[in-house]
Regions:
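Conformationally flexible catalytic loops at phosphate/diphosphate-handling active centers
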Residues: 82
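Conserved TIR/SEFIR loop-to-helix hotspot centered on a Trp-containing motif
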Residues: 87
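Long, low-complexity, Lys/Arg-enriched
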Residues: 1-79, 90-142
Length: 142
């Protein structure tokens, strides 16, 4: 649902989608990739979709892989966004370190009042709010 919200509310259309998943949660990753592909096509573009499977709770490897990917993409002048909504804590934590250190463009999170197993547009907008923590971080007083 976060991806749909980002596409529709932010008009953010990535060239590359990189999915990170832990081994225990990787069984449906092909379905996730297919869903992202279908949504992207509905919005008129076709990003490359790749994924990386990591060991469960392997924070160090996750952080290293994410930092390596982000540095490589920044060298190629990509704008970089991450979605932390569905992530498990070790992966989210590993993603937030480079987000701040390497100054990512967006850290998206879909805040929902109640988890509902429904598509984004079927859930009342009052029940969900797309947040961009990088935008919000700029408002933090130092």
């Amino acid at each position: 649902n976060t991806y749909y919200a980002v596409l529709s509310l932010k008009s953010y259309y990535p060239d590359l989608i990189q999915i990170f998943a832990e081994e225990s949660y990787s069984k449906g990753i092909d379905n996730v990739a297919e869903g992202l592909k279908v949504l992207s096509e509905e919005f008129g573009f076709n990003p490359r979709i790749e994924y990386t499977i990591l060991g469960d709770n392997d924070f160090v490897t996750a952080a290293e892989k994410m930092i390596e990917l982000i540095k490589r993409l920044k060298e190629q002048e990509f704008r970089i966004a991450i979605d932390i909504t569905p992530g498990r804590k070790p992966l989210v934590s590993a993603a937030l370190i480079p987000a701040m250190k390497l100054r990512l463009d967006h850290v998206f999170y879909l805040a929902v009042k109640e988890l509902l197993p429904m598509p984004y547009m079927m859930i009342p907008l009052a029940q969900q709010q797309l947040r961009d923590f990088m935008e919000e971080a700029m408002k933090v007083k130092k």
